[in-house]
């Protein structure tokens, strides 16, 4: 994992020694801003989150970027390098909680924002931050309708003749944003065994 993610994720936080079969997928991205932030302009300020306020190193710059605004959201698109890729930053209107914002973006607000982007001079204040995320994907996959893979109905005969089931399916991600750009990595792994995940269905005889 460390080699594939350039050291962002050194090891996965899950024992797989007893798994009969392991599936592993890695992603890595590193992009430099087209217009970098000046570290001398970074200073500690208050960031107002959904539940609390925290002091963070806040980056400042005035640059031309993609910009869009609706009654519910404001968005800025910051390009990397030759502008083949960009980061879209979305700020919900005051008083909007994250769950409500997430539902709105999934229901079409994201598409509306991206269709409204236009070039503008923008005064930017962006936190310098690092995030780490580790979660099981089993519940999410089951909510999407994937059930057999975690039960006695699983059929992986194309991979192995053994009657195996997914007993772990996890993802670990890291995101870093600073004055130079963005670095991100993700590792998704699944372990198959003859045992079932907690709460899984019993094998069908």
Where are these regions (language model features)?
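Secretory/exported precursors with cleavable N-terminal leaders
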Residues: 1-205
């Amino acid at each position: 994992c460390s080699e594939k993610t350039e050291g962002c994720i050194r090891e996965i936080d899950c024992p797989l020694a007893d798994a009969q079969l392991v599936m592993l997928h890695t992603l890595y991205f590193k992009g430099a801003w087209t217009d970098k932030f000046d570290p001398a302009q970074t200073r500690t300020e208050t960031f107002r989150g959904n539940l609390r306020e925290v002091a963070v190193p806040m980056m400042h710059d005035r640059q031309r970027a993609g910009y869009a605004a609706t009654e519910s959201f404001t968005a800025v698109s910051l390009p990397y390098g030759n502008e083949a890729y960009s980061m879209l930053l979305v700020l919900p209107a005051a008083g909007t909680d994250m769950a409500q914002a997430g539902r709105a973006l999934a229901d079409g607000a994201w598409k509306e924002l991206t269709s409204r982007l236009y070039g503008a001079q923008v005064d930017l204040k962006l936190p310098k931050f690092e995030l780490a995320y580790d979660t099981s994907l089993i519940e999410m996959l089951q909510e999407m309708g994937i059930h057999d893979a975690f039960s006695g109905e699983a059929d992986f005969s194309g991979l192995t003749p053994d009657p195996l089931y997914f007993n772990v399916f996890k993802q670990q991600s890291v995101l870093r944003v600073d004055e130079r750009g963005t670095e991100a990595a993700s590792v998704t792994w699944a372990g198959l065994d003859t045992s079932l995940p907690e709460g899984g269905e019993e094998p069908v005889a």
